[in-house]
Amino acid sequence: ILCLILAGKVGSNIASEIGTMRVTEQIDALEIMGVNSANLLILPKIAAMVSFIPVLVVFSMASGITGGFLIAQFTDIISVSKYIYGLQSFFNEYYIWQAIFKALFFAFVISSVASYYGYKVKGGALEVGQASTDSVVVSSVIVLLLDVVLTQILF
């Protein structure tokens, strides 16, 4: 779920940023100066996403466990002892590593699809918005399909 949210927010930002640079001919200026524009613009975004999304996944797991504990503490839905017993008895370290591994793939897909759609924009502001929307839709579908495939492979 976290990666789908990030596909919408971060993916659209990447696509619109690179798309705006393409429309305003900043990428063309970089290429005229002899700079590899794809290497300069796309690689840092992919590296940042691949290194930071697994951290966000671990943080979201910790937040979920803490939220569950607080619900158990302040409501009568489940007792705190049953909640802690459930965490201890059903904990499997493999699930955490699996989530981190899947997050690496999702981060690469989100950033590379958004960068591709932003990099290939031709036209004006309307096309930048369309490329941003297309990148969100395509990366969300790929993340969902990749989640199914990776789950089948890892289990």
Question: Which role does the model predict for each range below?
Answer:
Residues I1-D28, L56, V113:
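Hydrophobic alpha-helical transmembrane segments of multi-pass membrane transport proteins
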Residues I18-I42, V128:
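Short cytoplasmic-facing helical segments at TM-TM junctions of multi-pass membrane proteins
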Residues L41-A62, V136, S140:
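Selective transmembrane-helix segments that form parts of the transport pathway or gating/packing helices
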Residues A62-L104, S112-A131, I153-F155:
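Membrane-interfacial helix-loop-helix connectors in multipass membrane proteins
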Residues V128, D134-L150:
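Final/C-terminal transmembrane alpha-helix of multipass membrane proteins
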